[in-house]
Structure formats: structure tokens, C-alpha cells
Design a protein with these regions (language model features):
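Electrostatic, structured charged patches in enzyme active sites and in nucleic-acid/phosphate-binding
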Residues: 1-146
Length: 146
């Protein structure tokens, strides 16, 4: 089930963008938004406020990838760091495996999702390296879910 809604920040000045129109597309994204909003070490944050061009290997066309988050934060040593964050289920970060009972259609769809994600993340890593940013993929493990 997909969850979508508008997040209303408690600290709108920390948000870089339109703080009245912060859209989450999953409960995991909403949880991360709440973390960014309320954590005093997060100095600034944004959600889907910029895009990165990438080559879609399934169509051989240049597409736009909108990373889930950008954060500027103070690390444990009080250094200021900047990261681009993607929130994804662990299963979408791993190469799909054929299992008993998995349909051919499901396997094809999972494979397409996987190769597109890999292309997006490769472009994001290059984009971030050029700008001295970190790129992180956060799964249910990092978000403390399940």
C-alpha cells in the first residue's frame, strides 16, 4: 500500500523550499522528514527540490532523477556535512533473484526497477562527488523499521 500526504514541519525555517508543500510518498519518507524536522543536528533539509540527469538503461534516454532528500547537518565532531539521501526498501537495492512462485512478470518488473535505480544512484554518486556531498541510501535498517 502506498501512502502519500503533505508534511507540515514544526520548524519550517529549517526547510529549504516551499515548507507548505512538502510531499511524502511513503511512511518511511514521512518518518525521515520528521527526523530532519525535529533533530537539532539537522541544520537544513529539503525533499525532492532538485534533479540529477541520468541515462535510463531501459530506454537509452536521459531522464531526471529527483533524490528524496538533501540534508545539511552537524556530525558528532560538530563538522558541517551535506548529504543527498534516497529512502528505499532494502529489496529494491538488491539484485532480484528468481524464486519459486515468483512470476516471470514480477521478475521482469523487479529487474527493470533494479537497473533503473542503479543508473540513478551511479549518476547521484558522480553528482555528489563533484560537489563534495555524500550520497546515502537509507533502507528500513537505517530507519529502524521492522
Amino acid at each position: 500500500m502506498s501512502y502519500k500526504g503533505i508534511y507540515r514541519p514544526s520548524n519550517p525555517k529549517k526547510y529549504k523550499g516551499d515548507s507548505q508543500n512538502i510531499i511524502y510518498r511513503s511512511l518511511w519518507e514521512r518518518k525521515f522528514m520528521n527526523y530532519c524536522d525535529l533533530n537539532e543536528n539537522i541544520l537544513e533539509w529539503a525533499s525532492e527540490e532538485f534533479w540529477i540527469p541520468y541515462l535510463d538503461p531501459t530506454t537509452n534516454r536521459v531522464r531526471r532523477y529527483f533524490p528524496d532528500f538533501f540534508i545539511k547537518y552537524k556530525d558528532k565532531d560538530s563538522n558541517i556535512r551535506r548529504s543527498v539521501i534516497e529512502v528505499k526498501p532494502m529489496r529494491e537495492t538488491l539484485e532480484p533473484k528468481a524464486t519459486k512462485g515468483k512470476s516471470r512478470k514480477t521478475m521482469i518488473n523487479e529487474s527493470i526497477t533494479y537497473v533503473k535505480n542503479q543508473a540513478k544512484w551511479k549518476a547521484a554518486k558522480e553528482f555528489c562527488a563533484d560537489r563534495k556531498l555524500e550520497f546515502k541510501i537509507m533502507t528500513e535498517k537505517e530507519l529502524g523499521i521492522r
